[in-house]
């Protein structure tokens, strides 16, 4: 499963070692390289497209007719921040085997007209929270900027990816001498406390000047931007025996990456395999490129029709389909063991986590849980279970949201991790391998032979 784009020198060395390299470490190194080189959802989707094309997938455009054939593989994007890849078997298909993950993570977005002058000495950037984050870890660390820039080019408007890959801004904390409450549950204000320092006044360099220089364009050609702050600390393998990994955006790019590698490697004979990566999960999914949109439904209908099906055959195929909604889960934290449910206590490095919720925040029920457990057993992948404590409300994720558009059996899963929604998260070195093995087996499984 070595399809990651922009392979680093470190990863090349790992691949050259071949069978001598630990399979778990190898998968984790590929994931870390993917995270380090793709700092925004737009970079992630572009990288996935390159991975798919390298593996023989053909790109489709929503604005054009879907011309597809049996035995071929394709992908389609929306907003350049969501992507659906799919592989069609050589014979008539029975249903759809679908995995879903999301491309976005909590961060700060740079507002329009962002530069603010302070005390006639400094320039700050006006930013706003994106998603529900742990705010404190963003302070006192060098930050970069990444996203997309819309540029006027002749009579056309072009999209350019931007990654300012240097230490360009920072949010310094207020010294303990001026904030004696800092270690007593201080509540950060999202407007006043989190404006990163950008420059000294008198430097005569604006944010748009830097953007224009990075992209090699005229500043006057910049029409608009979607830009986010990025944590510049690289991913790493750590622990006494290299048992753990740490990186930004493990939630949910671990599932994004594992699904992409798995669908490339899978040999699906009975069902159409699809890997969906939606945007905006962290802010409710209610966008044209989110899980609540018609993106998945539109693709399924068009694929079925392009293969000669009608509305009735589409509904039959959906009834024989299954979704794995993959969004990371909370590991028991060694310093906060009381925060976990007393009976369902997943930990890092112990396998895929199946998530349950009595109030239907997750899609898993006895049927879908049984199917996925059986698939994991066949893949020789260990399984754990997660539920919230009964006095803690849980959030919903991709499965239930997408089921409002395409109703089918689904299971919610993820990999156990610590510090979810921090700019730097931790997990187990074995878990990317486990997830890839489980997803590959899922793509290759005839669900109708198990259940319907």
Question: For the regions a protein language model found, what residue spans apply to each?
Answer:
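N-terminal hydrophobic/helix-forming segments and targeting peptides
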Residues: 1-452
């Amino acid at each position: 499963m070595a399809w990651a784009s922009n392979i680093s020198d470190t990863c090349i060395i790992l691949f050259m070692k071949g069978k001598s390299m630990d399979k778990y470490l190898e998968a984790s190194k590929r994931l870390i390289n993917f995270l380090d080189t793709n700092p925004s959802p737009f970079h992630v989707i572009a990288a996935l497209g390159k991975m798919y094309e390298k593996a023989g997938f053909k790109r489709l455009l929503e604005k054009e007719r879907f011309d597809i054939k049996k035995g071929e593989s394709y992908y389609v994007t929306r907003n350049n921040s969501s992507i659906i890849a799919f592989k069609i078997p050589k014979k008539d298909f029975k249903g759809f085997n679908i995995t879903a993950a999301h491309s976005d993570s909590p961060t700060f977005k740079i507002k329009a007209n962002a530069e603010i002058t302070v005390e006639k000495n400094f320039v700050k950037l006006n930013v706003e929270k994106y998603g529900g984050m742990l705010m404190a870890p963003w302070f006192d660390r060098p930050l970069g900027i990444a996203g997309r820039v819309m540029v006027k080019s002749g009579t056309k408007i072009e999209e350019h990816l931007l990654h300012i890959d240097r230490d360009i801004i920072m949010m310094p904390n207020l010294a303990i001498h001026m904030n004696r409450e800092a270690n007593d549950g201080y509540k950060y204000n999202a407007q006043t406390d989190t404006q990163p320092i950008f420059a000294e006044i008198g430097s005569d360099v604006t944010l748009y000047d830097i953007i224009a220089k990075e992209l090699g364009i005229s500043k006057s050609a910049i029409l608009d931007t979607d830009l986010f702050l990025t944590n510049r600390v690289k991913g790493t393998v750590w622990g006494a025996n290299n048992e753990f990994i740490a990186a930004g955006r493990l939630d949910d790019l671990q599932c994004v990456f594992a699904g992409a590698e798995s669908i490339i490697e899978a040999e699906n004979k009975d069902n159409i395999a699809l890997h969906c990566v939606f945007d905006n999960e962290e802010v409710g999914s209610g966008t044209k490129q989110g899980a609540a949109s018609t993106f998945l439904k539109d693709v399924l209908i068009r694929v079925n029709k392009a293969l000669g099906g009608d509305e009735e055959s589409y509904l039959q195929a959906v009834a024989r389909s299954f979704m794995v909604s993959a969004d990371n889960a909370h590991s028991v934290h060694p310093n906060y063991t009381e925060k976990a449910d007393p009976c369902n206590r997943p930990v890092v490095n112990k396998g895929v986590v199946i998530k349950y919720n009595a109030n239907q925040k997750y899609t898993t029920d006895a049927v879908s849980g049984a199917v996925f457990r059986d698939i994991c057993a066949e893949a020789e992948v260990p399984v754990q279970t997660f539920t919230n404590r009964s006095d803690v409300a849980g959030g919903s994720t991709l499965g239930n949201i997408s089921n409002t558009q395409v109703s089918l059996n689904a299971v919610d899963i993820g990999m156990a991790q610590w510090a979810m929604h921090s700019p730097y998260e931790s997990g187990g070195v074995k878990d990317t391998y486990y997830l890839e093995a489980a997803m590959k087996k899922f793509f290759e499984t005839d669900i109708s032979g198990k259940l319907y």
